[in-house]
Amino acid sequence: MKKYLALALIAPLLISCSTTQKGDTYNEAWVKDTNGFDILMGQFAHNIENIWGFKEVVIAGPKDYVKYTDQYQTRSHINFDDGTITIETIAGTEPAAHLRRAIIKTLLMGDDPSSVDLYSDVDDITISKEPFLYGQVVDNTGQPIRWEGRASNFADYLLKNRLKSRSNGLRIIYSVTINMVPNHLDKRAHKYLGMVRQASRKYGVDESLILAIMQTESSFNPYAVSRSDALGLMQVVQHTAGKDVFRSQGKSGTPSRSFLFDPASNIDTGTAYLAMLNNVYLGGIDNPTSRRYAVITAYNGGAGSVLRVFSNDKIQAANIINTMTPGDVYQTLTTRHPSAESRRYLYKVNTAQKSYRRR
């Protein structure tokens, strides 16, 4: 009964699905994959609701790691935005034992997203000698957690001192919550600085922009997935941005999921796409600040949608932008772009980039 939710149906789609991200290139197969993935994720959410109850659906996202085990009766949820780790179970027998096991595995898991299936209850989390959360969490004595002994002792402390329960219908949900260290975001970002610097030099893209995109897209969560199947730290989509980058590099096809879940490959691909937006798709914009605003917005909603804000003719759109001040371009994109998400995206990335430039 390992595949209690019949999620074996999802496995083939997980290999090839894509999303409506970051580009204007679409094809029929991509649309079918995206729609199919969305339908199956809706079914996944429905089945989780059947097991956990109304308003208890938690699914992995760009800034949320969620892993179910124990026939979907136990889950680990890392909220990378809020900096909290919540371990919960609805197991009817020995709930503390289920929680203890999940706490230890979550604290000691590695940083290889390609080895973990977030859409099944398979216990495929391996304990790592260099845990992904090392330094982002400290135990009750204020020490970082690297080894199983310390993780086990901390789990025992949590179960004794922080165990909570709540009722949802006939179900009792037991949980413990762990707060990450205040600078957990910086701790994660630091893991990838070398990769960011390498990609920055390779493609001529500012390090601060790459970091700001990563923060906004995934909060530096290497396990990041979206309901529309954008993948990894920079939320790259296989059949749009990924395909464009591969084509520009003389490669056929699209990057695989495992390729995009590799942090170095993801950062390289995402940065290559930023360079394409800057140098090719939006290269007709003269002012570098105006072009940066356009590139940021295009990374979220596509270059075509950015240019159409100014004119349906792409050349004319660039000419119009070139008559405007950078401030006017920013104001236009944050107020007139048809996508509310893209309007907010420019504000978020621009704000984050300023903070990285000050460091």
Swiss-Prot record:
One of its GO terms (cellular component) is cell outer membrane. A lipid is attached at residue 17 (N-palmitoyl cysteine). The keyword Protein biosynthesis does not apply. Coiled coil: none annotated. Its EC number is 4.2.2.n1. Residues 1-16 form the signal peptide. It is found in: Cell outer membrane. GO terms for molecular function: hydrolase activity, acting on glycosyl bonds; peptidoglycan lytic transglycosylase activity. A lipid is attached at residue 17 (S-diacylglycerol cysteine). It catalyses: Exolytic cleavage of the (1->4)-beta-glycosidic linkage between N-acetylmuramic acid (MurNAc) and N-acetylglucosamine (GlcNAc) residues in peptidoglycan, from either the reducing or the non-reducing ends of the peptidoglycan chains, with concomitant formation of a 1,6-anhydrobond in the MurNAc residue. The keyword Ribosomal protein does not apply. InterPro entries: Lysozyme-like_dom_sf, Murein_transglycosylaseC, Murein_transglycosylaseC_N, Transglyc_AS, Transglycosylase_SLT_dom_1. It is a lipid-anchor. Pfam families: Mltc_N (PF11873), SLT (PF01464). Keywords: Cell outer membrane, Cell wall biogenesis/degradation, Lipoprotein, Lyase, Membrane, Palmitate, Signal. CDD domains: LT_MltC_MltE (cd16893). Belongs to the transglycosylase Slt family. Murein-degrading enzyme. May play a role in recycling of muropeptides during cell elongation and/or cell division. PANTHER family: MEMBRANE-BOUND LYTIC MUREIN TRANSGLYCOSYLASE C (PTHR37423:SF2), SOLUBLE LYTIC MUREIN TRANSGLYCOSYLASE-RELATED (PTHR37423). This is Membrane-bound lytic murein transglycosylase C. The gene is mltC.
